[in-house]
UniProtKB/Swiss-Prot annotation:
InterPro entries cross-referenced by the UniProt entry: HAD-like_sf, HAD-SF_hydro_IIB, HAD_sf, PGPase
Residues binding substrate: K155
PANTHER family: HAD SUPERFAMILY HYDROLASE-LIKE, TYPE 3, PHOSPHOSERINE PHOSPHATASE
Leading EC class: hydrolase
The organism's place on the tree of life at top rank: Archaea
Cofactor(s) demanded: Mg(2+)
Protein name: Phosphoglycolate phosphatase
Record-linked NCBIfam families: HAD-SF-IIB, Pglycolate_arch, SPP-subfamily
Origin organism lineage: Archaea, Methanobacteriati, Methanobacteriota, Stenosarchaea group, Halobacteria
Length: 227
């Protein structure tokens, strides 16, 4: 790789995975060998990207819960932003209306969340949006779940937090993603690439769109820096 390889911020689901959400094994050596900083940015709770970094041998630099949680191992900094109590209250009100979060009794999707709440896509959206708006929150449809989240945080604010810790500029970054929740980090990054399976918002905000989808799209996105 060239010494000018930029730092990388990358989504997980739909970007590093295949269509079944399994990690594409071909992305592993790329991430492990990337000579600049790698930031994993996801809507998932913090244990998921932390585990990914751990098993890939990467420094644990993560943006989780769509920017609500930021951890930078190099500076031992953990930042939590967002109104978790309001998000939990939305969930309680939603259940009071007879709806369900949709992830079963144990609910691994929400178990470790610290700033937001997620609801399965097979649950009704309109009442969730109404309850969220009443508490000053928004609902993001990432294509994998409905995220009840604070509008003051996103992956862009997460990237800014990482950069403030590491003395980097967001404009130095290559960003790769597939969803509406990647849009703000796309806006800040020096180059933003959407994989072909991305939603309309991500496609519109990207500087470049790959021909390939999912993990293959990620490989195409980073190929100019590996040739």
């Amino acid at each position: 790789m060239d010494s000018d390889t930029p730092p990388l911020i990358v989504d997980i689901d739909g970007t590093l995975t295949d269509e079944s959400r399994a990690l594409d094994p071909h992305v592993i050596p790329v991430l492990r060998e990337w000579p600049a900083r790698v930031v994993i940015a996801t809507g998932k709770a913090m244990p998921f990207p932390i585990a990914l970094c751990e098993f890939l041998g990467l420094d644990r630099t993560v943006v989780a819960e769509n920017g609500g949680v930021v951890f930078v191992e190099a500076t031992d900094e953990l930042r939590l932003e967002g109104d978790h109590e309001a998000a939990l209250a939305v969930g309680e009100s939603y259940r009071d209306l007879g709806h369900d979060l949709g992830f079963g009794q144990i609910d691994l999707a929400n178990r470790w969340r610290e700033t937001e709440l997620v609801v399965s896509l097979d649950q009704p959206l309109e009442p969730l949006e109404e309850l969220a708006a009443a508490r000053g929150l928004v609902v993001l449809d990432t294509g994998f779940a409905y995220h009840v989240t604070d509008p003051v945080v996103d992956k862009g604010t997460g990237l800014e937090a990482v950069c403030s810790e590491l003395d980097l500029d967001p404009a130095e970054f290559l960003a790769v993603g597939d969803s509406v929740n990647d849009a703000q980090m796309f806006d800040l990054a020096g180059e933003a690439v959407a994989v072909a399976n991305a939603d309309e918002t991500a496609l519109e905000r990207a500087d470049r769109v790959t021909d390939a989808s999912y993990g293959d799209g990620f490989l195409e996105a980073v190929a100019p820096y590996r040739d």
